[in-house]
Amino acid sequence: NSHLILSVFLESYMFSAVALIVFLLLIQQEEKPLAHLVPAGLFSFGITMTNFIQTCILFFITTPRIKTIFKYVLSVLILAVFLAFIQDSLYPSSDPFYRPLSYSQEQDYRFNLFEAQPQSVGGRANALARSMLMFSVVAPQPLILLEETGCSFPCSMVYYFDKDGVYRISSYEGFGKGLVFGWLILLATAGWLFFKNFRVAPKAFALSTALALTMLFNFTLHMNYGDDFMLYSPDWTYALVFFFGISYESFSEKKWAQSMLLIFLLGLMINNLNLFRELLNAVLPFYG
């Protein structure tokens, strides 16, 4: 659902997903020239450095050549520093990434796991897990908030952190509840198929392993950083969708599997478009 919303804006979050998908496709080619991989890595680095780390995970797991990976990382970093230096020369007000002061504001988005209350840590883990595995695919009922978050205009969220340090998380109702239940069954089956095949031929499923590790990386990262998971969802949803598709690759020619997936996708479209109806109904009285 966040992709439908963010895709209508010129936002770096959507380009973030594009950069990762491009890199993912490049490393699947038989020939992996650095002349192609470095620009893709630089593109992802320019959007967010954490996504560059994802490219390193994908590269290392699928192509475990230390020397090649070292050249890739070094080339991207040298080019990134050079381009950032040029930008700083042309626009002195910019904050290049190699200056420690440029990260001072990031402290505002940090979540300290060691200082937070246990209920806050557990609530954040629950909200993040739901955002990654459920909300990024099947839209829940949005929370329409006003005084709860100090909004004078309806604020739509899928979770919020209240004054008592408790995460209030949106849920599913009616058709959406059945749809997300079906999605979780399909996702659990995809995970089972992955582990089953990985035990037999781990090298053949290196890409699925890399995708799973990038999702784990994102979970670890955002347990410690970020205040709105929806904004970062493109950074892990691409991995979730590719992991899901690869797991069911052996069923791709089965008519019954194609029919089931088509029915699920139609249901997903209906459910996720309902999110926009809920949002429009919430703001309509303010334009009456």
Go through each PLM region and give its residues.
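Aromatic- and kink-enriched transmembrane "portal" helix at the membrane-lumen/periplasm boundary
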Residues: 1-18
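Transmembrane alpha-helix segments characteristic
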Residues: 202-221
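Specific aromatic-rich, kink-prone transmembrane helix
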Residues: 15-34, 239-243
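Lumenal/periplasmic acceptor-binding loop at the mouth of the active site in multi-pass
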Residues: 109-194, 211
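Signature aromatic-anchored transmembrane alpha helix within multi-pass, membrane-resident enzymes
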Residues: 252-273
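Hydrophobic alpha-helical membrane-interfacial segments at the cytosolic entry of transmembrane helices
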Residues: 66-90
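Membrane-interface alpha helices of multi-pass inner-membrane proteins
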Residues: 33-64, 75-79, 263-265
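Hydrophobic transmembrane alpha-helices of multi-pass, membrane-embedded glycosylation machinery
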Residues: 22-24, 53-65, 234-238
